[in-house]
Amino acid sequence: LTPVFGLEDVGGYGRDVALYLIEQGYFVKFVNSSLSNSERNSYAMTQKNDSWDAQCVANVLIRQLPHLPDTSPSDIHWVIGQLVGRRNAIIKAQTALKNQLHIQLNYHYPSYKDFFSEVDGKTALAFWESYPSPSHLKGVTMEGLRTFLLEASNNACSTRKAEKILLFVQADGEVKREYQTSRDFIIQSMVRNISYTKQEIKKMDTELKVTIQKLGMQLETMPGIDTVTASALIAEIGDIHRFTNSDKLARYSGVAPIKMGSGGKETMKKTKQGNRKLYDVFYNLAVQQVQVSKGSKIPRNPVFYAYYNQKQSEGKSKSQALLCIMRRLVRIVYGMMKNKTAYILLRMPETKAS
């Protein structure tokens, strides 16, 4: 007899267990938690404890052994997933810091939103750190502020920007309060933190680019796919060879509709099942494919834009047409990942969007 192990978790804490068992020569099957949960709820009296969970996993393993996927942990896909997760965590922290900075700046500079186009831009951060409150601008001439802004912005900001800021500060009036030094320190601390996270994101993007290149894929040759998007696709899909065709990848990502019916009547319905993170990646990618340049009105990807309009002319709504784009993208991405081919943008007669 050859023992077979079934594990619910093969990507998190259970990954090391799966690797150890495989190295010892055992067969390890991945049991989706939804299957064991369905097994648990199939009994009249439900319970939840470790031993019963193990029994439910074993029951699923016995009944569905031929249909359960083998566990084959891939180090590079796992590492890419960890890098993507870390990057997302930094982005989330940066967003929280930016929101906190908005709150603090509102106390010090009521008109701060009119100072710079981006509150966390390079020049803006330099200004907030040097002048966290209007009291630091006392005695600063327009020429002095202009010189500071020119240096911080690499000669992008002019005298007009310095004049504009000083006029807004004057119009806002006195905003100095008790413990102003501590309040200023809070803003300066946030600025340093935001600057640090920006540097970390750049380093993370560089590391991701180097790592995904080891797979030999050319996903970034497709319009709309940069290093971040390519990394997200690889992290969520994993080893592409575990999907025998693009239809299975479409079902896994929740892009493919499911069959619903009763009493001999059946229809295809959009589903919210599948990997929703992967679904979001394909959705955002589909939106980019049908984008149109604001100035020239030329579509970013003429082929997909024409296909998008074709589906709408057939009676589909915009969301339905976008879903058709997503399904086609799944097929293309599947082929590019499996065969490690580049995307070839077909040339079409340039037509401006209406």
Predicted regions and their residues:
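A detector of single, family-specific signature residues
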Residues: 1-354
